[in-house]
Amino acid sequence: MAESAPARHRRKRRSTPLTSSTLPSQATEKSSYFQTTEISLWTVVAAIQAVEKKMESQAARLQSLEGRTGTAEKKLADCEKMAVEFGNQLEGKWAVLGTLLQEYGLLQRRLENVENLLRNRNFWILRLPPGSKGEAPKVSRSLENDGVCFTEQEWENLEDWQKELYRNVMESNYETLVSLKVLGQTEGEAELGTEMLGDLEEEGPGGAHPAGGVMIKQELQYTQEGPADLPGEFSCIAEEQAFLSPEQTELWGGQGSSVLLETGPGDSTLEEPVGSRVPSSSRTVGCPKQKSHRQVQLDQECGQGLKLKKDTSRPYECSECEITFRYKQQLATHLRSHSGWGSCTPEEPEESLRPRPRLKPQTKKAKLHQCDVCLRSFSCKVSLVTHQRCHLQEGPSAGQHVQERFSPNSLVALPGHIPWRKSRSSLICGYCGKSFSHPSDLVRHQRIHTGERPYSCTECEKSFVQKQHLLQHQKIHQRERGGLALEPGRPNGLL
C-alpha cells in the first residue's frame, strides 16, 4: 500500500494537462512587479543623492558666508581705527590752520604798517623789530623828541642834501638808542635811560651852541677805564663837524679840557690841552719839544674833555715832558731824544720806543789747529785728533788722494771736517752725480771710480777697498797658521 501511493501520485501528475495561457500571464505579472519596484528604488536613491548634494552646497555656502562675515568684521575694525586716526589728524590740521590764519592776520597788519611808514617816508623805522601782535614798531620818547615830523608837502619842498641830513640824523639817533638798550624796553626803563642821558649831557662842558648853523644833538660819551689793550679808550657819538658854522667851530675848539690818549703796552701816554688844537679833521699830537713821535688821527672832535689819569703800570716818567713809560729802556731811549743823541723824528714808527730783544754777538772762533796731511783747520784739538786717526786708518796714500780730490772749501771731506747732519745735496759724487748721506760712504764710492785699494795684506799682497774686507782676509791666514782646514766651497777672500 505504501508503494502504490507514490505511483498514484505520479499518475495524477501525468494525467493533469499543462495549459500554455497560464504560464505567460504569471511571468508578465512578476516582471512588471519587479520593474516597478526597481524604478521606485532608483528614484529614491536619486532623490537622496540630490538632497545630499544640496546639503553639501548649502554647507559650502554657509562656510563662505562665515568667512565673509569675519572679513567684514575685520574691515569694520580697521575702518574704525582709520576714522579715529583721521579725526586726530583733522584736529591737528585745524590747529595748524588756526595758527596760519593768525599769522596771516599779523602779516597783513605788518604790511599795512609798512605801507603807512613808506607813505610817511620813515624808512629808518623799518630796522626796528616789529611788535608781537603785528603793530608798528614802538619808538622811544627820546627818539620821537629828536625827530622832526614833516608833512608830504614840506618833505617835497626840502632839498636832497636836507633829506639826506635828516635821514642820517635819525639813523644815528636810532643806532645810539639801540646801543644803549633804550629801545625794546618798558616805558619805565626807557624813561630812566633818557633821564640818565640827560644828566650826563648836563654835566658836560659843552652846552647849546648859538644859532647860525645846523644843530646836531650830542649823545652820550663814555670813557673806558680798563686795561690799555682795549680797542678804544674813549668814544664820542657825534655827527660831523662840517655842519657847524665858523663861529661854533671857534667856540668848539676853544674849550679848555684835556684828552686822554691811552696806548698799548710799551707806548707812551700823551697829554695835550684842547685849547691848543687846530679845528681840523686830523692832527698830529706828540712830544712838545720834538714835535711828535706818534701821529694820532682825530676824526671827530668831542665836546667833553677827558681828564688824564696816571697809570700805575707806567712807573717811569720823563722829568722834562712828563711822559710815562712802562719800561726803563723806553725812558732811556726817550731821554736820548732830549739830549740830542738820537732824536726821533715824526716819521719814526711807534715801535721805536719798545724794548728790542737783546741778541748775543756771534763771534767767529779762530781755527788754531791745522792738519799736516790735508791742511784742514779745526777749532778744537779733539776734532783734530779724531781727524788724524782717519788718516792713520786709511793709509799713507789716502791723505794725498783726499788732498788732490777735494778743495779746502769743499763740503765733501772726511768725517772730522763736516758735522754728521749734512744735507744729501751737499755730498754728491763728482764722477757719476750720486748723493750720499755720510762722507765715508762717498769716499768708498769714489774708490770704485778711481780703482784705489788702500788696504793691502802683508802676507799675500792682496789689496782691498774696505778695511773690513782686509780683516776678514787676515782671519783666513790665522786659520791656516793654526792648522784649521777651510770649509769646502768658501772663498779665500773678498776681492
From Swiss-Prot:
Q: Where is the composition biased (Low complexity)?
A: 16-25
- Keyword field: DNA-binding, Metal-binding, Nucleus, Repeat, Transcription, Transcription regulation, Zinc, Zinc-finger
Q: Which InterPro entries match?
A: KRAB, KRAB_dom_sf, Znf_C2H2_sf, Znf_C2H2_type
Q: Name one GO biological process term.
A: dendrite development
Zinc finger boundaries on the chain: C2H2-type? 316-338, 369-391, 427-449, 455-477
Q: Tell me if Nucleotide-binding is a UniProt keyword of this record.
A: no
MF annotations from Gene Ontology: DNA-binding transcription activator activity, RNA polymerase II-specific; DNA-binding transcription factor activity; identical protein binding; RNA polymerase II cis-regulatory region sequence-specific DNA binding; zinc ion binding
Q: Which Gene3D superfamilies match?
A: 6.10.140.140, Classic Zinc Finger (3.30.160.60)
Superkingdom of the source? Eukaryota
Determine if DNA-binding is one of this entry's keywords. yes
Q: State the residue spans of region: Disordered.
A: 1-29, 264-290, 337-361, 476-495
Main location (coarse class): nucleus
Gene Ontology CC: nucleoplasm
Compartments where located: Nucleus
Signal peptide extent: none
Q: Which residues form the KRAB domain?
A: 141-219
Q: Name one Pfam family in it.
A: KRAB
| Family statement drawn from the similarity comment of this UniProt entry | Belongs to the krueppel C2H2-type zinc-finger protein family.
Q: Which PANTHER family match?
A: ZINC FINGER AND SCAN DOMAIN-CONTAINING
Q: Briefly state the protein's biological role.
A: May be involved in transcriptional regulation.
According to UniProt, the name of this protein is: Zinc finger protein 212
